Amino acid sequence: LVYQVVQQNLQAIGINAGIKSYDESSWLDLRKSGEMDSFIATWTMDYNDPANIMYTFFGSAAKTRIRSLNYSDTEVMARVAAASGITDDAKRMAEYQALERKIVVDDAAWVPLLGSTHLFAIGDRVESFIPYWAGFSNFYVNDVTLK
């Protein structure tokens, strides 16, 4: 359904997009080759820092070829590399916000579509349960006690 909604939204602004399905091996080969015009994929951050997204997707020409549709703005790539070295938290976050605005809003090189909701049922006897920050629902439970 997501594919059809994206296709309809693109058609509404005059872009004709087709939908093709591939087996995983072919899909990965196409991504690595740089011959795929666009794709929808899922991804979850490994650690809670904007560098995790920016560097993974836009840290080099090779990363953008494999993960981000051959985005070729070398100035952005240089800024991504430099941002990880900024030690002032406010300046670092401001740079990552500016990079996100450039990549997502100005260039539309990456379009986040949705986020997952994870629900947890906790009994009255459970103490100190803290879900993993990224929302994974398939994680190990440590340091949880019962009353």
Model regions: which residues?
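Bilobed "Venus flytrap"/periplasmic-binding protein-like clamshell domains
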Residues: 1-8
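Periplasmic binding protein-like
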Residues: 8-60, 95-96, 112
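Solvent-exposed, acidic/flexible segments
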Residues: 3, 24, 47, 68-77, ...
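Hydrophobic aliphatic residue packing
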Residues: 6, 13-15, 103, 121, ...
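Bilobed periplasmic-binding protein-like "clamshell/Venus-flytrap" ligand-binding domains
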Residues: 39-43, 86-124
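Conserved C-terminal helix/tail region of periplasmic/extracytoplasmic solute-binding proteins
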Residues: 9-11, 17, 84-85, 91-94, ...
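Short, solvent-exposed loop/beta-turn-alpha elements that line the ligand-binding surface or hinge
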Residues: 30-35, 55-85, 114-147
